[in-house]
């Protein structure tokens, strides 16, 4: 299942079919009615793999939080399904997420103040990877300078009480596959920074 919020990318299902998928479907879930529909949940649960497209993580967070879509993603993960995403679709999979509620935050601004109001973090969404915060387009956009402040941010009480936060930055054309034992394998042409 290819899940997204905005305009369709019609080549993605064919791409997954070429890689060996037996079936694919596009789910354009861009409003609360669709996101909270039992029919949407039931349709999603017919698939073993969920791929969440890039876009804007605020749209995902704002539209899918506390809905049947969030339930489907979490339930499928707990049943052993594969949950993956690219760009914003990956960013929402960690316990601590940068919601981008006020748009992106640039590394130089984030480095100046780890509690900058544009660093909008949340810890009440999917929680697929509970001890991480993910960032993407990492080296290409110089995001080490914002991932460190994300990890140091003290605005969320659940992370104030945690003894560590792991920042994980993934470069373009690169993936990290994390198994149920929290072991990751990097694939692709660049790097993952932890």
Residue ranges and their predicted role:
Residues 22, 45-49, 79-82, 129, ...:
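Loop/turn elements at helix/coil->beta-strand transitions in domains of secreted/extracellular proteins
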Residues 1-53:
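N-terminal beta1-alpha1 cap of cysteine-dependent amidohydrolase-like domains
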Residues 47-48, 60, 84, 88-89:
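A substrate-binding/cap region within the structured catalytic cores of diverse enzymes
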């Amino acid at each position: 299942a290819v899940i997204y919020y905005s305009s369709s990318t019609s080549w993605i299902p064919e791409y997954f079919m070429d890689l060996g998928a037996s079936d694919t479907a596009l789910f354009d879930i861009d409003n609360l009615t669709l996101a909270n529909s039992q029919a949407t949940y039931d349709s999603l649960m017919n698939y073993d793999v969920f791929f969440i497209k890039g876009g804007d993580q605020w749209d995902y967070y704002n539209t899918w939080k506390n809905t049947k879509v969030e339930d489907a993603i979490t339930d499928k993960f707990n049943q052993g399904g594969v949950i993956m995403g690219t760009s914003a679709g990956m960013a929402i999979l960690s316990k601590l997420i940068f919601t981008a509620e006020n748009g992106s935050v640039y590394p130089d601004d984030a480095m100046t103040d780890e509690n900058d109001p544009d660093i909008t973090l949340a810890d009440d969404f999917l929680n697929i990877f509970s001890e991480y915060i993910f960032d993407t387009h990492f080296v290409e956009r110089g995001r080490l300078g914002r991932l460190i402040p994300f990890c140091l941010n003290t605005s969320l009480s659940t992370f104030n009480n945690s003894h560590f936060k792991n920042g994980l930055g993934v470069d373009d054309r690169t993936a990290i596959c994390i198994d149920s034992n929290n072991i990751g394998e990097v694939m692709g042409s660049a790097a993952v920074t932890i």
